[in-house]
Amino acid sequence: PVSLATLTTGAMPSTHGVIGARWRDYVENDAVELIAGRKGPGPYNLIAPTLAEALLQHEPGAKAVSVATEAMSAVIMAGHGGEAFWLDSARCGWETSPYYAPEVPEWVARSNRERYNLSYITPEWRTLYEKGRYLNTRNWDIVLTGKSRKDKDEPGEGRLKLTSDYDKMLYTPAGNTAVLGFAKQAIAQFKLGDDATPDLLCVCLDASHRISEAYGPESVEVEDMYYRLDRDLADFLTFVFAQVRDGNATVVLT
């Protein structure tokens, strides 16, 4: 969260106050959770304004929406203003917290009732392309196209035990696809970019770093994730420039 806070505030940790996901208070020796508070997940320990906050303060009528797989990422991008949404770890739907809104909008609630996110999850993670396309060779859980699970190159049953739908979203490319899919809905439902007033959409693809941490940067899983992400981003950006007024959108990718 430290680097994300630096990106969204333009400040160093000594200024924005984020030094980790949790730490010890050096006065009381109490454990401090970055986004934990009485109103649910919120930017209680983020002390510098985010870009979203600055936009809302200086541009009346502007809208700012933040979307991520994890609550911490969505909160750090949104800061103290705007809309923030993340995946519910229990049912794998989309949620917010009372800090931002009493409840999610009806279009989000409807998607949750229909369990739409489950459509992104597949029984097993298979490579997008044939084996010869991949430069990396180490694979743990992914199944190469044209092979079955029992023919997997690596022995054993894989490194991760993805038992919950939330884990399957967080540690497979499905998480990125779901986030970008929800971001497209947010653009349409909140009418982002629909007029001359600038709006802001912040998206964090948490599954990317989760997969990299779990399997290693030289794994087939990471390579396949980026192939899929490239395709997902192409689809998302095509939607953005078609949806936004006069195609007038600025994209920052980091």
List each model region and its residues:
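Alpha-helix capping and helix-loop boundary segments enriched in small/acidic/polar residues
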Residues: 42, 170, 174, 213-227, ...
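His/Asp/Glu-rich, glycine-adjacent segments
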Residues: 12-197, 206-213
